[in-house]
Amino acid sequence: MPNSKKLIIDGAESFDIWHFVDDETPLAEAPAIISLTRLHDEGAELVAAGKKLGVILRAGEKQGEDVHALKPFLDNLAVVAIEFPVYRNGRGYSTARILREQMGFRGEIRAVGEVLFDQWQFMHRCGINAFEVDADVSLEAFNEAMGELSAAYQPAADPQRGILWRRHN
């Protein structure tokens, strides 16, 4: 079955070198995105073995996985994938902002799951720079959506200032 998703990083289509690996599957040489549980259980030895690692933060039914649990591993992670399971679950926005603003993460923050057209720009403003989108989404449509709104009401992880802050300065 062909992949129904494509990866857009920093506004350009990208070949995805990363593989999501479940907790029971042994890691190969390829770069792997693993669960937070596996990172805590095996992270130190995987880092010592020189594995190229990423982690996925799951949203969960009632409460998502705690981004602060990444702190001991953050310098060794190249990718943090944030799950957006349904449109109405916005915890991933806060997770991305915490990673960028409070924890200083400069690697790839990837939105996975229900990553929809009208959310891309807001996700980007919160620090997400990589998006798994449906394979039929054109790069032109993606970049057009990213520039759709020229003003924002709230401050975010990006340098754009909110309308109220611009008005009073």
Features from the language model and the residues they span:
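N-terminal, charge-rich interaction modules
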Residues: 1-42, 47
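Structural preference for beta-strand elements that scaffold enzyme active sites
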Residues: 31-33, 52-56, 79-81, 108-110, ...
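Active-site-adjacent beta->alpha loops and helix N-cap segments on the catalytic face
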Residues: 38-46, 87-99, 139-148
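Acidic (Asp/Glu)-rich catalytic clusters
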Residues: 43-50, 67-76
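Catalytic cores of alpha/beta
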Residues: 55-57, 65-71, 117-130
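Glycine-rich beta-to-alpha transition loops that act as phosphate-gripper elements at the mouths
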Residues: 109-117
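Glycine-rich phosphate-binding active-site loops on the catalytic face of alpha/beta enzymes
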Residues: 126-146
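C-terminal helical cap(s) of enzyme catalytic domains, especially alpha/beta-barrels
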Residues: 140-167
